[in-house]
């Protein structure tokens, strides 16, 4: 029993066998596809710098806003409204925020002189009452400004609300002033300091480099590297109106993108600035009005703590820093090249698809007969036969049958179920072409006295004439030389096969049958060709000659070794061979499955 594994199995190499087709058309297609793939791979390699190892950045941001705004607002004192002018500088309109953000106030509402005491609630929707029963003592509504005392008191001459303990007077629900009080904030400027680090490449840089003009202002075309931005220009870049946004406020994003090439031969690492609005300007303004928040300024008056509540509207600027730094890495280059090598197989896939399509049965039966222009494509059938070797599954039911009066071979892949093999219809299979180089290996006795084309001995197999039938010849026999099978009843149908489909001359009467199948000299030569020291005497030699004759007939009539393995010999040929090389006991086993 052979070993299941050995060192010889380890030290071996397997490769594919290819078929080279000499064709101008397919050669042109191959090189066009190869050059297309090569151009794409090269372009992607250089344009996207796929030979580099990419590293994300680590960033820190610091901002400084500069500018002064004059504010004019209406102030009511003692029932008299008057205009008050004021100045807002950086400390007034900017508030510290966490993270990479800063806030610029553009509008506001004030509630001055608030102190903790009892007062009526502001009569907003759902807050009015008619009696004390509409108020609950100790109730704290999340939408309320304080804690209810349980009393319903007048807010003004027409409306009554629940009394609350809160910062009084309660904040009024006024609309934001139009136009915005700090509408001149569009002229403010902001300086953005951005430091970045690529820890994987051990590289650090920033957006403000030595020698930069500190009095510059950012412009997308004329000064794209300046880190000082005018707020109005930021809105103008994205098509927004600063005056409109300043009324209710909003959220703006300042994007800083770093695409750094850290290779020494083409070093470049500069930021690219862009802007976008981050809040939804189409949201229902009655529910979500812009961006605002409240803060208070506390003070004491006559020993009492008071505050001024400010509802600030403005623009929050979020600075978003992202990007990568790339540097040449041999491993990345090798990985990219390896991943793109499979693209060159596109030519093979396309050409194989063309060959398989034009060699299909549909093209052969429908396209070529009706389209004269497509006839040259029939050469793909030849390419297909050279490229592909069809293999039929070697099942126990597989059998091949050849009739001397038909040009093709029949493949029978079914159970006979008692029906004679002569009458079973199978699938037509083209007869393989004979390799005439094999004829040179035949015995010398086959080379003398060759039949001349046209002589009667060559044409006799094609004549259809009445043949005297043997007394023992069964009904399915067409040549008159077949004999009944000796096999059991369940296997007998396998040997019920004649050499002809229609009545005519038997193939065993041909001269070539005698020279190839029955010639003892030829068969002995074949046996010695395989075993040079074989003893050609004794009882066992007849068995070897008989099986060699079976194989010689199968190889002669079926050509293909795969078909010969499953070939069923006609009854007339089988009995002719058995009579020439008989078995001592006279009992024969019949066809055996080879696998």
Swiss-Prot record:
The chain crosses the membrane at residues 23-46, 329-353. Glycans are attached at residues 74, 187, 202, 213, 241, 284. Disulfide bonds join 119-168, 129-152, 135-162, 216-226, 260-269. It is a multi-pass membrane protein. Phosphorylation results in its inactivation. Residues 360-377 are annotated as: C-cys anchor. Its main location: membrane. Activated by high extracellular ATP levels (0.1-2.5 mM). The synthetic analog 2'(3')-O-(4-benzoylbenzoyl)ATP (BzATP) acts as a potent agonist. Does not undergo desensitization, instead, undergoes a facilitation process where currents progressively increase with repetitive or prolonged agonist application. Palmitoylation prevents channel desensitization. The permeability of the P2RX7 channel is modulated by the amount of cholesterol in the plasma membrane. One of its GO terms (biological process) is positive regulation of prostaglandin secretion. GTP binds at residues 546-547, 550, 567, 583, 589-590. PROSITE patterns: P2X_RECEPTOR. GO terms for molecular function: ATP binding; channel activity; copper ion binding; extracellularly ATP-gated monoatomic cation channel activity; identical protein binding; lipopolysaccharide binding; magnesium ion binding; potassium channel activity. Residues 1-22, 354-595 are cytoplasmic. Changing residue 88 to A: Decreases inhibitory potencies of antagonists. It catalyses: Ca(2+)(in) = Ca(2+)(out); K(+)(in) = K(+)(out); Na(+)(in) = Na(+)(out). The modification ADP-ribosylarginine is found at residue 125. Residues 47-328 are extracellular. ATP-gated nonselective transmembrane cation channel that requires high millimolar concentrations of ATP for activation. Upon ATP binding, it rapidly opens to allow the influx of small cations Na(+) and Ca(2+), and the K(+) efflux. Also has the ability to form a large pore in the cell membrane, allowing the passage of large cationic molecules. In microglia, may mediate the transmembrane transport of exogenous NADPH. In immune cells, P2RX7 acts as a molecular sensor in pathological inflammatory states by detecting and responding to high local concentrations of extracellar ATP. Belongs to the P2X receptor family. Homotrimer. Interacts with LAMA3, ITGB2, ACTB, ACTN4, SVIL, MPP3, HSPA1, HSPCB, HSPA8, PIK230 and PTPRB. Interacts (via C-terminus) with EMP2. PANTHER family: P2X PURINOCEPTOR, P2X PURINOCEPTOR 7. This is P2X purinoceptor 7.
